[in-house]
Amino acid sequence: MKSKKLCAAVLAATLGLGFMAATPHSEAATRAELAQISVNQKGTNFQYWNKDAKSYQALVSYVKDVTNPKSQNYIPIEDRIAVFDLDGTLICETTPSYFEWMMYLERALNDPTFTPKAEDREYAKVVKKAIYETGIPGDMERKEAKSQASVFAGMTLPEYEAYVKKFMQTPAEGMNNLKRGDSFYLPMVEVVSYLHANNFKIFIVSGSDRQALRILTDGIMPIEKDNIIGTDVWNLASHQGNTDGLDYLYEKNDEVIRGEFVLKDVKMNKVSNIAREIGQQPVLAFGNSSGDSSMFNYTIVNNKYKALAFSLLCDDTERELGNQKKADKMRASCEKYGWIPVSMRDDFKTIYGDNVTRAK
């Protein structure tokens, strides 16, 4: 009986402190445990950053400055807008590629319940070869997005949600002890929590499918579903067919289904979507690739407020599936444009927890 009471007390203490406070980066965090990560307004309880990292110091110094009403750089709460890319910024994008690209391959090539169009199956083979062998060419983003929309077209929103959630349970290829849906970067989840504690309104602006983003991030971080911007497909009524939405009446026997590709939310399209959907210039931007460059510059150029852009460098080849060549190229871009580099190798105490390792 005493041992049971002791176990109960320990469990209660663990939940009260938060999982990460009780077991600092000792194992891979589940989604429920990721959701417990909480950084206070003063930022005194960051656990997963090296405190001597210039990027960490720049962020904390900035937030203290712009949230201080006595500072000349004070930013009113309504103007504290922070935008985050997802893949490679908040979650792993190298297992061995983006979450949604790997899910597309599963749907087009391996799903026994689905027969894709011949052209989608053949293009999925091209994408798979690019991911595993030849490298992804610049024109593949748009083509993949169109084919991805095609293989999921006709699904109701609940059906698509179930498919995404199922794929989230698959192992993160190339890593040990990690699922795709759990592969969030612990230090970056802390950043989101810290900014939320300081009354920043946080948006995700990603090249991934908008609905997939909502499902993938749900419950992990304090980001509302309507604050998620991503690649879009048409949403149609199930009996609408080719009828224009101006000429169709949604009726009781209809359901909303997924349709064709609309827009890939990368590069300048990120800026266009921010201007249209947020309606004001961000003051903080976080990303990791050339697809975020326009978003970075839009944030820091001609801003009436003090603004910063942070770019993660994929330079950790021991704890993560990094790429030093890409990291060096992004560091050079940071120096050129005035973005702040974040070294995953040097600035993060851990990425997923010490029990998560690269597969040999």
Where are these regions (language model features)?
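Positively charged n-region of N-terminal signal peptides that target proteins for export
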Residues: 1-5
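Non-catalytic pre-domain segments flanking phosphatase-related domains
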Residues: 6-86, 94, 101, 108, ...
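Solvent-exposed, charged interface segments at domain starts and junctions
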Residues: 11-13, 145, 220-226
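C-terminal cap/substrate-recognition subdomain and adjoining C-terminal extension
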Residues: 29-50, 64, 162-360
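Electropositive phosphate-/nucleotide-binding environments in soluble metabolic enzymes
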Residues: 53, 154, 268
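Short, solvent-exposed loop/turn and secondary-structure capping segments
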Residues: 93-96, 101-104, 215-216, 298
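A metal-dependent, Asp-based hydrolase signature
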Residues: 96-98, 102-182, 186
